[in-house]
Each structure stands twice: as C-alpha cells, then as structure tokens.
Amino acid sequence: MLTDIHSYLPISAQLATAGQPTAEQFGEIAQAGFTTVINLALPTSTNALPDERAVVEAQGMTYYPIPVDWEYPTLRDFQQFASALAAAADQKVFVHCALNMRVSAFVYVYRCLRGVPREAAAADLAKIWQPNETWQNFINAVLVE
C-alpha cells in the first residue's frame, strides 16, 4: 500500500509526496497510476536505491533525478523541479526524497506560486515538518524571486 511508504502524503489526485520508497513500492506506485517519479534526494541519502532510475523505468514510469543538497537548496534546484512538474502536467506525479522534507518544502513553494492559498499549502507542509532555518530561508527566498 502507498500509505506504507515513509511520510506518504497525497496532495491531489495528480500529485503525491513521500520519503524514499523501496524497489517493491515503486511497483505499487506504478500500479496506482503514477507515470512520473521526481527524486530530490542525493544518491547518498538514507535508504537511497543505487539503481533507482532502472527500477522506476522498468515499471514504465518517467524518472527525473534532481539531487538537492540538504544543507544548500538552491533556486536552480527549484527551477528544475518546477520544469519537471510542468513537463508532466497532464500526468500523475510521485515526488520523493529521503524523508519527504525536501519535497514538502518544494511542493509548498510550487503550490504557493500557483495560487494555492498559503494556509492550505502550509497545512500540508506541517503534516511532514516545520522547516528549519536553512529551509525557511530557502522558502522565503524562492517566494520573493
């Protein structure tokens, strides 16, 4: 079940976020109708799958690796993320990192920039974590760009 994936959080019918899935869970993700996977974790992150691209593509899904350094998230990282989501606009997208912390921050910013009320986007972010100073500064910087 998708709910068994660490910090799984569906945002809409077309977008879900989570921590690192196992190889087996990528099969469940595909069976649930997801066609695109965006990975914001580093290859060295906790529980990272060394062959994740192959695992995802073997399930018939498109794979976008966008490794985001936990200590130094950048506007360029966010722009790549937004471009990947735009490329998959008509698809069901599963976005993950190690613990759904990077992802929840990126999705919060993305939703705010697309007109979702901040209170609604913040409620989903709070289900995962309260961003630390590094990440709150990143969020604030991207929102004013």
Which ranges hold each PLM region?
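Glycine-rich nucleophile elbow surrounding the catalytic serine of serine-hydrolase chemistry
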Residues: M101-A105
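Residue-level preference for short coil/turn positions at secondary-structure junctions
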Residues: I11, G33, A89-D90
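Mobile, glycine- and charge-enriched loop segments
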Residues: M1-G19, Q25, M61, N140
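Cysteine-based protein phosphatase catalytic domain of the PTP/DSP
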Residues: A16-A86, P117
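PTP/DSP superfamily signal
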Residues: D77, A82-K92, L99, V109-E145
